């Protein structure tokens, strides 16, 4: 018995020393590797110290606590020197060390260190208190936040559209893409009382043949007393706006397969026929119609009252968008965003499969008669004559740059503004023609009636990073030097917001050309300069090893090693066989959610992201042929291995993640922010989102850690001084004070909310509605919910 009692204390000391030794060996070996490739000396030094601590513990010497206290304090000093008082950046540098330090001061542990050393326990306690104090201070003083207050003054802006205040009749409420509502029943003072008003379930869930990239991104529209929305499979629903009850639904019978790169519908468009532009037959058949784009290349016109097809439109209500396409394989051309509707024209473009081959279908933009569906014009960005209409023997151009995001429209100028993508394959461009380069990654302004080019502005030259313009542009009239200027705001993946006079494409906010890294892959080249807007959320400095992150110092070390193994010289570092760190990453700092602009206050709300990706070019060889095998289809995703058939390299595209699946760049990965559009200053910026729904295990209670999470979807703003946003990787709809960014309310969603909300009023009550259906590749919970919130009847 005495022998067993003696073994027990010794076993505890042995296990403690063994843990310290394993930590030390890991840090020493990994740290030497890191230093050899140009990284920090901290890790091998910390590893050596931990090995000495382990030796002292093995010998039961309390001097180990002195040395460990010194290591802990040195680590905190080093951490603050590297990243400042940033809680989330300090956490992986300190968490294991702090927990192990707490273990060492437990009485049943240090009492077993029988060789005394004066003050050792007290020294470690002091070191832990100092470390805890630093972390506590950092937790309440976020260096990434900007804490200002927007101006409250407002001047009613002129409007070119006659939209009833209570309606939301287009994707961005108006076709200017402002995502702003003049409603103010819900205010910053009462939004905390918001309650769930109704929930509608569409019944549209992931099917066995669907790709991983099935997403629920719809923003419903509301006209009169009816909501109109589409589901992931483009089923169209009309709901009573007050109760959420179904009025009718229409199913286009979309047949998908796993090669589709997208299965999604961001919204539908509305048109009311007018006697001066529509025949009596059209008005009798479909006086009010919903225009529904479908991922297999069809466009439907549906009677807004009955849900029946409009017989006088195209082929009994169905328009074939695959006509004259160079490749009509379903899924290669996918209209995923609602078209622009003018009094005369439907203007529609579509998504083209990224990174598949050099023989993909065209990204042509077309204008169709809104009443008959007849082709009025075409603009093929990759053709020598973009406006040439194909004959029966002639098709549109292979691999023309496409425009997949929602467009914007100025009715006064009759100009439609299209955010353009890059010619695919995206990550190698040595074979692109001048025509394919001409309008790629540009803002394109076309006459909506004729399709003729008004102007274009290119935001990335010879794009090798898939830095397409992916957000709906926003139109507003802004005061510049005392003069009102009609401008267009074009948020870009790079974090730049390009601001141009929408009449002529001239820059309103400077965007000087600056040199960028050189050295393209074999057979390619890199543009010598790129435009950098003065209005930007671009990172203020390039990433370094200090910006690497992890759950612990161990996976943080792995991320630092991976970082130094990649090619990275800042933004626009060219793709490489070595592997290139792409930051801002492929999701972009801005994505399809766009920004919200209050035209009266002349302020904007934005939700930028900061998530690096890694691209790696794969030379042709066994298993990586130049030409596609027979019957080859798309991969069904934009990430992972992409074949890029027809060019010298395939490519892999992935988020830059740690071994635990966490981003290797330290948080925040997502922000909510406000801009003063008169001064072009960022007034406030806050982290948004918690890891609650990204944890490796279910969390029964909310996780109060506001890390700043990745997101997909945009904000809306209201005259009630409230902004609403879902979008984040946790399942919440949130409300913020527009003036200062204070979070006022959040509502738990039943599934992922990767969609932009909307708001409207019916029967005297204001509602806020969001789609909660999840996002396949984003990894959020899938569902089929449309959720509405409103104030209770007795709210004050």
Predicted features and spans:
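Topology signature of small-to-medium multi-pass alpha-helical membrane proteins
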Residues: 1-149
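Hydrophobic or amphipathic alpha-helical targeting/insertion segments
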Residues: 99-114, 119-143, 239-246, 264-271, ...
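N-terminal pre-domain segments of enzymes
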Residues: 133-183, 530-538, 543-554, 633-638
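Mature N-terminal segment immediately following signal peptide/propeptide cleavage
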Residues: 156-205, 220, 673-675
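Repeat-blade elements of multi-bladed beta-propeller folds
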Residues: 168-172, 213-233, 260-298, 331-358, ...
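Short, solvent-exposed loop/turn elements at domain surfaces
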Residues: 175-181, 204-210, 237, 426-427, ...
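Extracytoplasmic/lumenal domain signature
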Residues: 192-205, 236-258, 271-276, 283, ...
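Segments forming glycine/polar-rich beta-alpha architectures that bind adenosine-containing cofactors
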Residues: 502, 574-575, 580-612, 617-619
């Amino acid at each position: 018995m005495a022998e067993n009692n003696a073994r027990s204390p010794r076993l505890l000391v042995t296990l403690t020393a063994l843990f310290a030794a394993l930590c030390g060996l890991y840090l020493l070996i990994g740290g030497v590797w890191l230093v050899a490739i140009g990284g920090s000396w901290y890790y091998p030094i910390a590893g050596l110290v931990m090995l000495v601590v382990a030796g002292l513990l093995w010998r039961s010497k309390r001097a180990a606590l002195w040395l460990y206290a010194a290591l802990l304090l040195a680590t905190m000093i080093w951490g603050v020197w590297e990243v400042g008082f940033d809680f989330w950046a300090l956490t992986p540098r300190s968490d294991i060390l702090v927990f192990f330090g707490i273990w060492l001061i437990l009485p049943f542990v240090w009492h077993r260190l029988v060789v005394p050393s004066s003050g050792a326990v007290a020294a470690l306690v002091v070191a832990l208190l100092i470390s805890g104090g630093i972390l506590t201070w950092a937790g309440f003083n976020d260096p990434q936040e900007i804490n200002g207050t927007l101006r409250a003054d407002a001047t009613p802006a002129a409007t070119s559209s006659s939209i009833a205040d209570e309606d939301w009749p287009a994707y961005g409420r108006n076709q200017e893409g402002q995502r702003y509502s003049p409603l103010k029943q819900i205010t910053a003072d009462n939004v905390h009382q918001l309650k769930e008003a109704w929930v509608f379930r569409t019944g549209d869930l992931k099917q066995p043949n669907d790709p991983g990239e099935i997403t629920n991104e719809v923003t419903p529209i509301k006209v009169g007393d009816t909501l109109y929305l589409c589901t992931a499979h483009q089923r169209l629903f009309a709901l009573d706006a007050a109760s959420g009850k179904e009025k009718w639904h229409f199913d286009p019978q979309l047949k998908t397969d796993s090669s589709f790169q997208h299965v999604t519908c961001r919204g539908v468009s509305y048109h009311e026929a007018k006697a001066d532009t529509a025949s009596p037959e059209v008005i009798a058949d479909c006086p009010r119609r919903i225009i529904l784009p479908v991922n297999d290349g069809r466009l439907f016109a549906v009677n807004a009252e009955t849900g029946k097809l409009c017989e006088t439109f195209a082929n009994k209500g169905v328009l074939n968008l695959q006509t004259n396409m160079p490749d009509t394989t379903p899924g290669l051309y996918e209209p995923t965003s609602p078209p622009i509707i003018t009094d005369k024209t439907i203007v529609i473009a579509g998504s083209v499969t990224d990174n598949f081959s050099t023989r993909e279908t065209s990204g042509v933009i077309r204008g169709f008669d809104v009443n008959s569906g007849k082709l009025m014009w075409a603009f093929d960005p990759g053709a020598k004559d973009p406006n040439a209409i194909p004959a029966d023997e002639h098709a549109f151009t292979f691999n023309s740059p496409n425009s997949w995001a929602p467009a914007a429209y100025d009715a006064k100028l009759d100009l439609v503004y299209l955010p353009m993508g890059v010619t695919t394959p995206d990550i190698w461009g040595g074979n692109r023609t001048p025509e394919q380069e001409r309008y790629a990654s540009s803002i394109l302004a076309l006459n909506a009636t004729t399709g003729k080019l008004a102007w274009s502005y290119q935001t990335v030259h010879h794009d090798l990073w898939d830095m397409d313009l992916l957000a709906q542009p926003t139109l507003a009239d802004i005061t510049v030097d005392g003069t009102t200027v009609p401008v267009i705001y074009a948020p870009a993946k790079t974090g730049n917001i390009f601001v141009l006079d929408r009449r002529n494409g001239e820059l309103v906010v400077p965007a000087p050309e600056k040199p960028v890294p050189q050295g393209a892959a074999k057979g390619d080249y890199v543009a010598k300069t790129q435009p950098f807007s003065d209005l930007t959320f671009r990172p203020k400095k390039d990433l370094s090893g200090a910006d690497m992150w992890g759950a612990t110092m161990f996976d943080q070390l792995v991320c630092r090693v991976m970082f130094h193994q990649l090619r990275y010289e800042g933004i626009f570092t060219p793709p490489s066989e070595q592997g290139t760190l792409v930051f801002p990453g492929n999701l972009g700092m801005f994505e399809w959610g766009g920004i919200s602009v209050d035209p009266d206050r002349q302020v904007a709300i934005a939700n930028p992201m900061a998530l690096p990706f890694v691209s790696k070019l794969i030379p042709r060889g066994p298993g990586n042929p130049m030409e596609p095998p027979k019957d080859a289809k798309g991969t069904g995703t934009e990430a992972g291995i992409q074949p890029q058939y027809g060019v010298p390299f395939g490519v892999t595209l992935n988020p830059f993640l740690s071994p635990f699946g966490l981003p290797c760049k330290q948080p925040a990965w997502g922000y909510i922010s406000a801009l003063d559009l008169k001064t072009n200053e960022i007034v406030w910026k806050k982290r948004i989102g918690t890891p609650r729904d990204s944890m490796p295990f279910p969390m029964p209670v909310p996780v109060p850690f506001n890390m700043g999470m990745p997101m997909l979807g945009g904000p809306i703003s209201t005259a009630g001084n409230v902004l609403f946003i879902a979008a984040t990787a946790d399942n919440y709809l949130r409300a913020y004070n527009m003036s200062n960014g204070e979070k006022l309310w959040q509502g738990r969603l039943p599934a992922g909310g990767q969609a932009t909300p909307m708001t409207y009023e019916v029967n005297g009550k204001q509602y806020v509605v969001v789609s909660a259906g999840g996002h396949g590749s984003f990894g959020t919970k899938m569902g089929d919910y449309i959720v509405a919130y409103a104030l209770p009847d007795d709210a004050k």
